[in-house]
Amino acid sequence: MAIVDLVNAGEQQQMGSKRAAAEDGDGGVDDSREYYCRRGVRHLCDSGITRLPGNYVLPASDRPGQAAGAAAAAGGSVKLPVVDLSRLRVPSERGAVLRTLDAACREYGFFQVVNHGVGGEVVGGMLDVARRFFELPQPERERYMSADVRAPVRYGTSFNQVRDAVLCWRDFLKLACMPLAAVVESWPTSPADLREVASRYAEANQRVFMEVMEAALEALGVGGGGVMEDLAAGTQMMTVNCYPECPQPELTLGMPPHSDYGFLTLVLQDEVAGLQVMHAGEWLTVDPLPGSFVVNVGDHLEILSNGRYRSVLHRVKVNSRRLRVSVASFHSVAPERVVSPAPELIDDRHPRRYMDTDLATFLAYLASAAGNHKSFLHSRRLY
């Protein structure tokens, strides 16, 4: 059900008192939670708050730098393995690139794709229109606000704003992208060039996904014909994320630890660091590589690979100095298609590890649970 678009005049007059209540800093849930869910963090940032509202304050054990390891506390970073698509297209070099891709999916669950063929004007245009969307007046953005996780176009806040015990410092715009011609007319009309720019980016992103996914199946030794056909007719959801400047970033997160549904997620980052991956028990910040896509293995690919490829936990930190924008594209099969471990990857030494699943099952789970800390994927495990 859509959330009310505009607060009434009485709510506007109460804003000062709500801000004061929000800045009590005790970490508890105060009476402003519904207000925050309706307005989002960009509005809070623009209102000039100087302390983090209690609804956004994480328990001490979950705060950045506290949950895992010295590297996180010290601000450790990681340069992810790099997959060069231009080399993948050269027959004499393809084998070496496939080995790099295979090792990255097994060890990190993350890698960066370069020389992907998507022009700088497409990538830069997408980041630019994303920033301009979040600069729109609040009433314009609120037209698309919904708490329905199944909505094809949805502006929202936090991670799962209906069920999050503590809200995340993040606003987002989700756009269903397939079939593109059927959904683009439901996308926002402001900024005026959003539909044109985002559709061009979505098409290019889908092409990169298909090329990388075909390579991943080849590296696994899995016959990819049927899978690739299902993915070509599958789903693509683009999430445009906005992480505004936060007055006390050490107390909260932009996104909690989670893994992604689907086969692969392709993330376009701006120059502001924030994405962290869990590796060897430590939270490590991914160094942004201009013009690249950060790609991570999703739950469906871990299932299809029978656990050989890893869908790993990741999260997003925020900062007090610069707004951060990213665009994540989630790719999978159609909701009714079943994902199973590939028969080629099951034998006496490698018994089947996962139950069959589908996207509809995931969406139902997300609507009924917090959906973080890989709990959905764990729910599909046989042992």
Swiss-Prot record:
Its EC number is 1.14.11.-. It comes from the Eukaryota. Expressed in coleoptiles, leaf sheaths, leaf blades and root tips of young seedlings. Expressed in vascular bundles of mature leaf blades. Expressed in developing culms and nodes. One of its GO terms (molecular function) is 2-oxoglutarate-dependent dioxygenase activity. Transmembrane segments: none annotated. Binds 1 Fe(2+) ion per subunit. It is found in: Cytoplasm; Nucleus. It is an enzyme of class 1 (oxidoreductase). GO terms for cellular component: cytoplasm; nucleus. 2-oxoglutarate binds at residues 243, 324, 326. Fe cation binds at residues 258, 260, 314. Its cofactor is Fe(2+); L-ascorbate. Plants overexpressing SLC1 are infertile and exhibit defects in shoot development characterized by slender and crinkly leaves. Interacts with OSH1. Involved in the regulation of shoot development and salicylic acid (SA) homeostasis. Belongs to the iron/ascorbate-dependent oxidoreductase family. This is Probable 2-oxoglutarate-dependent dioxygenase SLC1. It comes from Oryza sativa subsp. japonica (Rice). The gene is SLC1.
